[in-house]
Amino acid sequence: MESIEQQLTELRTTLRHHEYLYHVMDAPEIPDAEYDRLMRELRELETKHPELITPDSPTQRVGAAPLAAFSQIRHEVPMLSLDNVFDEESFLAFNKRVQDRLKNNEKVTWCCELKLDGLAVSILYENGVLVSAATRGDGTTGEDITSNVRTIRAIPLKLHGENIPARLEVRGEVFLPQAGFEKINEDARRTGGKVFANPRNAAAGSLRQLDPRITAKRPLTFFCYGVGVLEGGELPDTHLGRLLQFKKWGLPVSDRVTLCESAEEVLAFYHKVEEDRPTLGFDIDGVVIKVNSLEQQEQLGFVARAPRWAVAFKFPAQEQMTFVRDVEFQVGRTGAITPVARLEPVHVAGVLVSNATLHNADEIERLGLRIGDKVVIRRAGDVIPQVVNVVLSERPEDTREVVFPTHCPVCGSDVERVEGEAVARCTGGLICGAQRKESLKHFVSRRAMDVDGMGDKIIDQLVEKEYVHTPADLFKLTAGKLTGLERMGPKSAQNVVNALEKAKETTFARFLYALGIREVGEATAAGLAAYFGTLEVLEAASIEELQKVPDVGIVVASHVHNFFAEESNRNVISELLAEGVHWPAPIVINAEEIDSPFAGKTVVLTGSLSQMSRDDAKARLVELGAKVAGSVSKKTDLVIAGEAAGSKLAKAQELGIEVIDEAEMLRLLGS
């Protein structure tokens, strides 16, 4: 049995190793939750044996050593971290400790903020001008990242307004919105560059580039949450008041900052943010709760590495470790072969996860994944769980290589990978049962033809019994034939037939989307429908004509053109129309005749809207004569930026395109 000294030594060594990977190499090997668990275990042991605490223990300092490649900046006021709580009971205990330490039963109000998952930085302004910026580093000394911070558009190089202090050091978080993260990885996969495991790593890697020109290309953003140095000026005597003052001077502050009057209100804030988390557009891992009164903060003071007046209330972990038991290969509706990791089941963010996507062969190679490996699994919002990285330091001896198939696992046809594409595909087409099933599931889905009651299991049976080969065959089904399916009684069968009849009345855009043309999503389908107006005109369009549609480039235009050039596809469309599928005749909108500020303009929506859904906003803009595109280009006239707008906003600013916020959009819609 290990001695207490040995346990402490091993824990400290392990934590230092992972701190180095996290803070210095930007390549964490374990999830935050596992790091937190190890730190809690070390603290508990040191609490029981205080005589064994050493000055260099991870519990006695804030972060990790700065990278030698950067010059260093010593923080005039140490950048401390926060203590964590993980459940309501622990938060209420923290609340009680605060109340007990204050004199005369003073009322406490709480300033609650989002706990952003990025990189903590300090930014020093002298007479309102940005002069330096540094990472947290080890809490006393950080890396000089001034040149890189100056490239972040959200951070003002000069403050504006009145009564700006002679020296003001603001502290906050640099982070990368989800859209920007996806764009960076998409570009990296295309060019063979480094693919980041998560937005936090991407933000850290972007901010700590030795070449600021690379940082400038990354759509980083920033929210401030506190102050370090303050000289030659005054600030309000509440935390919220200070944040509002920062905002007046041009510093970005999250609009989710909330003042809570009681512990009950804090818990309500926590649960509301947890509910909204999937729609924020950027990663958070909890909320930060601070005593609002600066006077009370001073009374409460600090412990060795954290303030007594603040705490981070963390959400259930979105990353966990488990083992890969096998890798299987699924076939999608376009023939794409997707490797899927079969996992030892593990709870991630409150959901039991037993499968995770591996995307493609390149991703398996990048991860260095073998069957039997210990891996980190991430699940964020509604995103399909994915393997973040392999824990190489704990690789078992009996792992096996993952072998990508050369023949389709469903129909046996050759698997082909076109040069320049990451995805390998089955060449079997509609003779492949998997492709047929997935194509039909897409066709009847809610955003396509919206056939109520026709779920995946029904489609599986219809294909396996060879009742259905093409989408047109669905509309030939009878209640009698459906009754022969498993768990399908006469009433349910008739309901499906009725739903199919109802689905015949659709829109041109939905119909195009339902056909499952490669690279044609909802937005592109809507653009094609609006531009060409009728199926006959679209079918006859050349590749050059197709590229005139907003958001349609050479690749999409080629896929659309080739789809309609294929005789079997035209035959299926003819059958669908013969079965009664129809949509209203197009309403020709002449932008010149519409009195609207959006008429004739190509508009792009980015970020999340709070007052209406994206679909409703798109529909209203089209009614007013706009063309709504899915990406920003030189053809774009206007960008509407909601909360957490990412790479599209950055590109619009780079191209000098007009940008308005949701409030201005609503005002113009109303006018």
UniProtKB/Swiss-Prot annotation:
NAD(+) binds at D32, A33, E34, Y35, D36, S81, L82, E113, R136, E173, K290, K314. The active site is at K115. Its cofactor is Mg(2+); Mn(2+). It holds the Pfam family Nlig-Ia. It catalyses: NAD(+) + (deoxyribonucleotide)n-3'-hydroxyl + 5'-phospho-(deoxyribonucleotide)m = (deoxyribonucleotide)n+m + AMP + beta-nicotinamide D-nucleotide. The keyword DNA repair applies. Keywords: DNA damage, DNA repair, DNA replication, Ligase, Magnesium, Manganese, Metal-binding, NAD, Zinc. Belongs to the NAD-dependent DNA ligase family. LigA subfamily. One of its GO terms (molecular function) is metal ion binding. DNA ligase that catalyzes the formation of phosphodiester linkages between 5'-phosphoryl and 3'-hydroxyl groups in double-stranded DNA using NAD as a coenzyme and as the energy source for the reaction. It is essential for DNA replication and repair of damaged DNA. Residues 593-671 form the BRCT domain. The keyword DNA damage applies. PROSITE patterns: BRCT, DNA_LIGASE_N1, DNA_LIGASE_N2. Transmembrane segments: none annotated. It is an enzyme of class 6 (ligase). Zn(2+) binds at C408, C411, C426, C432. This is DNA ligase. GO terms for biological process: DNA repair; DNA replication. GO terms for cellular component: cytosol. Its EC number is 6.5.1.2. SMART domains: BRCT, HhH1, LIGANc. It comes from the Bacteria.
